[in-house]
């Protein structure tokens, strides 16, 4: 079962460690943190909220996601993570549950968030290329004014 990838998973939980961020020698930004996800449900018998077991995940984001996470996510934040689940085993009955994140962000059930869109510089060779989806500012001045 070593390194075997399974289906995608969506998990909500608490960022339990300060995110660790670094840049590889190849220039790939990586950010990872531990996520604690605890099931809670209302018990009619007890007439109160009951906490279930806590599941622990190591969440890792690469490239732009890793870079943005480093500036956006902090220990104690409530987040929702979507990505590929990977179970890594070693030794006698030791296992790590990892999520290679494709997307994550703050869980707005618990608070508010302010989004800032990032603009990345395209390589010079691509500057003159336009796709059918490109829109000139003169064609939609009201949209560009709102974005500014």
UniProtKB/Swiss-Prot annotation:
GO MF: single-stranded DNA binding
CDD domains documented for this protein: SSB_OBF
InterPro entries, A to Z: NA-bd_OB-fold (IPR012340), Primosome_PriB/ssb (IPR000424), ssDNA-bd (IPR011344)
Domain of life, source organism: Bacteria
One biological process term in Gene Ontology: DNA replication
Domain SSB: 6-108
Keyword Translocase: no
Record key words, sorted: DNA-binding
Subunit structure: Homotetramer.
HAMAP family found in the cross-reference section: SSB
Record protein name field: Single-stranded DNA-binding protein 2
Organism name: Tropheryma whipplei (strain Twist)
Higher taxonomy: Bacteria, Bacillati, Actinomycetota, Actinomycetes, Micrococcales
Designated gene of the protein: ssb2
């Amino acid at each position: 079962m070593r390194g075997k990838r399974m289906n995608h998973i969506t998990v909500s939980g608490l960022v339990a460690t300060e995110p660790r961020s670094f840049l590889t020698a190849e220039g790939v930004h990586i950010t990872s943190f531990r996520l604690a996800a605890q099931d809670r449900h209302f018990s009619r018998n007890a007439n109160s909220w009951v906490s279930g077991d806590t599941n622990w995940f190591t969440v890792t984001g690469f490239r732009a996601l890793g870079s943005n996470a480093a500036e956006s996510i902090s220990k104690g934040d409530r987040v929702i993570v979507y990505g590929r689940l990977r179970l890594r085993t070693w030794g006698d009955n030791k296992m790590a549950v990892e999520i290679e994140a494709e997307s994550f962000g703050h869980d707005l059930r618990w608070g508010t968030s302010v989004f800032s869109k990032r603009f990345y510089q395209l390589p010079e060779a691509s500057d003159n290329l336009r796709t059918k989806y490109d829109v000139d500012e003169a064609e939609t001045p009201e949209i560009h004014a709102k974005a500014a």
